[in-house]
Amino acid sequence: MSEGTNTVVRDVTIVGSGVAGLSAAVYAARADLEPLVLEGPEPGGQLTLTTDVENYLGFPEGVGGMELIQRGKEQAERFGADFRHGTVEDAALEDRPFELELADGDVVRTRALIVATGASARWVGADGEDELMGYGVSTCATCDGAFHRGDDVLVIGGGDSAMEEALFLAKFADSVTVVHRRDELRASDIMAERARDHERISFRWNAELLEIHGSREEGVTGATLVSHPDGHPTEKLDASAAPRAANGIVEETVDVGGIFYGVGHVPNTEFLEGTGVELADSGHLETLEGMTTETAIEGVFGAGDVMDPDYRQAVTSAGTGSMAALDAEAWLESQSVRSGSRALVGPTAQS
C-alpha cells in the first residue's frame, strides 16, 4: 500500500463525519492534534436524514439534523480540524504509522486512528422511500416517534429491532401495525410477547411494503402493501408475469402518517476486515472491556454507532466521540509521538 503514499503523517485521523466523528474532531483539535477527518461516502452520517432532533441537549426548540451536523463541523474547523472528502477502502494496521487507502488511490498515514463510520440502517427498497426518508419515513423510532402522536403508523420487520420500534411508537401513535413478510416473528419470545399483548399493536402477516405515498410537503400519507398466503410476496411479484390476483397476491393501500423501518443496521466496518481489529458477529467494532474506546490494536479507537449496537443516539455518539479523542490523546502522550509541541522520539519519529 505504501506506493504513492503521502509523506505527511497525521497525529490523529478520524474516519467518519457524523456526530461521533465531529465530537472527536472538536476534542482532538482543541488538544492541538490537528486531526484529519475523512468524511466518507455520506458526509454527516445518518443524522442528515432526520429533519428535526428534539432530544439533543441544548436545543429546547429542537434542531434540524443537517444544521446540527453543520454546526459541529464549523466548531471542529474553528479549532483546527481538517476535513477531506474521501472514503477508506483498505487499512494497513500491522505497522505504525497506520496507512489508509482511499477510493481515489491516495494513502493517508496516521499515528492514531478513530473509527467513527457509523452503522447504516437497512432500507427495504419500496418505491418512494428515497424521496420520503426523513419526511415521515424513519429508521429510528426513538428519534422521530414523538412526531407521530395520534397517527396510524407502520413498522416494517419481524425481529427484535422491529418490536422495539413498535413498542416505543405505541406510546405516541393511535395504532401501530407491524408488517412482516412471514407468518411468524424472528424476535425473541419476550419481545414478541410484549408486542402481541399491546393493545395498540397489530400485525400484518405475509405482507411487505411495496410503495410509499406522500410528499416532502405533506409527509407520508399512505402505503401500498402486498401479501401472499405463503409469505415473501414481493419475490412472487417479481417472478410472476401473471396478474397479481391470479398469482395469489393481494394488493392494498392503507392510510398512514408514518413508516418506520425495523430491519436492522449494518456497521460500516468492511475496510477493517482482516486488519486485526476485532469485529463482533454483527460487524460492530469491538472495544476493550471497561470504560474505554480502545480496540485490540493499540492506537485504534472506536466511537459512535459503529461500536454501539444498543443505544444508537446522537448524544451517546457525541459522548463516545469525545472519549475516543481523549483516549487517543492519552495514548499519543504515552508514546511520545505527537508532532505538535512535543519532540518526536521512538521508532515512529523517523516515519
Language model: regions and residue ranges:
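Beta1-alpha1 glycine-rich phosphate/pyrophosphate-binding loop at the start
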Residues: 3-6, 10-79, 151, 163-189, ...
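Phosphate-coordination loops involved in phosphoryl transfer and adenosine-cofactor binding
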Residues: 9-11, 85-86, 149-151, 206, ...
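Residue-level detector of alpha-helix initiation sites
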Residues: 18-19, 42, 119-121, 160-161, ...
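A Rossmann-like FAD-binding core segment of flavoenzymes
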Residues: 76-95, 99-102, 107-110, 171-289, ...
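Glycine/small-residue-rich loop that forms an oxyanion/phosphate-binding "nest" at active or ligand-binding sites
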Residues: 83-103, 107-143
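A conserved FAD-binding loop/helix module that cradles the flavin
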Residues: 163-165, 297, 306-351
